[in-house]
């Protein structure tokens, strides 16, 4: 390789690194997560392409679960397994499983166009846009335009908020170096932890969100629920930042999938 060519390549790499740093660093040395992301599949991150099937495929109800029961915790690197449920909530899960196996989705909030809830929202196979300002970070999910806000200004949930749980819950966060630490409470008990595991009104979610490489975001999630779980459940999700023209989320009209097209 010619010295001139090698120097040019090094300059390009260095400029790219500097450009990435200037984009990712926000405010007082904290990363800027702003952008549109898609889930990075196991073994690598998707290169910014929109999910196959798009909006119409997303209105199809998920297949019935085939596992015999929810078991295990984070035991194989980034491959999460299902939460360990207490006997009371294992019985609830059995009702959900039997309902799905019979072709009914009565107990499935997503199949009924309700929000996915937390932490399930962070594991959906759809795009997600993050908008970051000094005092808050807002997550917009492509699934049914669901959103959640993480407040960074030091506020705490009031008793009124705790008494009125929502699907996204109430999230507050702070920075520990380059990692955003988020605590979420006041979560609606009709949502699921994952795709089918129920939880109680006492569930809380802690996240540690950070860049693990340029444009690749990692969310390490710990779920605690003394009534529904025999021990805290951990899972990890990664997301790849999209580049134009794939950095635009599509409108998601979930109800159209339920009633059919008017035409």
Predicted feature descriptions by range:
Residues 2, 20-263:
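PEST-like low-complexity, intrinsically disordered acidic/proline/serine-rich tracts
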Residues 1-7:
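N-terminal secretory signal peptides that target proteins for export/translocation
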Residues 9-20, 24:
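Bacterial N-terminal signal peptides
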């Amino acid at each position: 390789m010619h010295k001139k060519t090698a120097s040019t390549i090094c300059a390009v790499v260095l400029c790219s690194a500097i450009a990435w740093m200037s984009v990712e660093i926000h405010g007082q040395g904290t990363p800027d997560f702003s952008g549109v992301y898609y889930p990075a599949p196991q073994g690598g991150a998707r290169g910014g392409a929109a999910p196959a099937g798009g909006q119409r495929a997303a209105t199809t109800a998920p297949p019935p679960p085939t596992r015999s029961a929810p078991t295990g915790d984070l035991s194989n690197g980034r491959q999460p397994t299902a939460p360990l449920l207490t006997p009371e909530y294992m019985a609830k899960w059995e009702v959900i499983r039997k309902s799905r196996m019979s072709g009914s989705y009565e107990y499935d909030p997503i199949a009924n166009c309700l929000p996915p809830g937390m932490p399930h929202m962070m594991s959906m196979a759809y795009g997600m846009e993050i908008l970051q300002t000094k005092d808050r970070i807002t997550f917009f999910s492509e699934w049914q335009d669901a959103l959640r806000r993480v407040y960074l200004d030091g506020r705490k949930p009031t008793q009124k908020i705790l008494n009125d749980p929502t699907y996204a819950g109430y999230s507050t966060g702070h920075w520990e170096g380059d990692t955003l630490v988020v605590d979420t409470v006041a979560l609606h008990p009709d949502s699921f932890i994952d795709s089918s595991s129920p939880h109680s009104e006492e569930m809380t979610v802690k996240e540690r969100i950070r860049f693990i490489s340029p444009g690749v975001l990692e969310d390490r999630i710990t779920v605690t629920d003394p009534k529904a779980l025999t021990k805290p459940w951990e899972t990890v999700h990664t997301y790849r930042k999209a580049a134009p023209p794939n950095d635009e989320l599509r409108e998601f009209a979930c109800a159209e999938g339920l009633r059919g097209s008017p035409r």
